Amino acid sequence: MKKRFSMRNKLLIIFGVLIAAAAITEGLLAVRTARKAVVEKIETHLKDKATDVAEVLDGRVNAFFQFAEGIARMPALKNVNIPYQEKIDLLNKETAFNKLIKLLAFTDAQGNCYLEGEKMLDVKSRGWFQEAIKGNKFVTEPFISGADKSLIITFSVPIYDDNHNIVGVLTADIDGLWLTDQIDDIVVGKTGYAFILGATGNAVAHKNFDFVVNKFNGMETGKKDKTFESVAKLHATAIYSTKPSVVLYSYKTTVSIASYAKMKSSGWTIIISAPVSEFMGRLMSCALKC
């Protein structure tokens, strides 16, 4: 009787342990599955966010191109027989009506840009001229103007005559922080934000204005400063990728998650970044490591 009772207890203990183990395993799998679902949801949200921001900015850039192309179709600009000073006067009047524009300028097909006071500037080596004279719309990364040392962005479009021959280039200079202003209100998590990188990795728009003014390049900085190595990898991955995606990176003691997408109008890269802890705290951090 004692043996049977002992055997019975042993069996109860064994089955109890098996049931407990099964319950724990099921619980762990459920937690892991839940974590994975949360991570996937956040990744999808961030990719969609980056894509949406890129599309909105493309819309604003293209709207400005349309505005510039409208001016480029003015008869006085298309007619090569109209004196250059008359063209300049016309563009000055248009500039006065638009607070966003700092300068509208006419450049002939030979690369001579005509300015106020019968001044002429050779711009045939400028990227914006070389693209527009081939029939392409172009927008520059922010740069320091040689005229007044201010930070500007230049939009350029070709000017066609009535026979659809390119007879010149119209340029529109705007504030170099215009793009930064466009993404200023984008917030992800609590402190996350958006920024834009140019084709070679220079900061085109960033909440830190100095990055834009000084053309901060995370990839180049990462070669000299090890604290930027992870940032440099993020920037390189984002710039050379053609599809939106999500990556993890770290800077000093902060682990962040970032999504990126391309702007079709310029080829620049939108990156949205925020500390991982701002999404799901310890649970999110653990999930990403699992």
Cite the ranges covered by each PLM segment.
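Amphipathic coiled-coil signal-relay and dimerization helices
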Residues: I71, T107-K119, G201-K207, S259-Y260
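Extracytoplasmic/periplasmic sensor domains and loops in membrane signaling proteins
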Residues: I82, I88-L91, E116-S145, D210-L248
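Juxtamembrane extracytoplasmic/periplasmic/luminal helical "stalk" adjacent to the first N-terminal
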Residues: F5-P83, K93-L100
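Extracytoplasmic/periplasmic ligand-binding sensor regions of membrane-associated signaling proteins
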Residues: T95-L103, T107-I186, K190-Y193, L248-S250
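Output-coupling edge of small sensory domains
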Residues: F143, V157, A261-M263, S277
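Short hydrophobic beta-strand segments that form the core of ligand-binding sensory/regulatory domains
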Residues: T154, V169-T171, K262, T269-S273
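Intrinsic low-complexity, intrinsically disordered coil/linker regions enriched in small/polar
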Residues: D162, W178-I270, F279-M280
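Cytoplasm-proximal transmembrane signaling helix
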Residues: L12-A20, R32, T269-I271, V276-C290
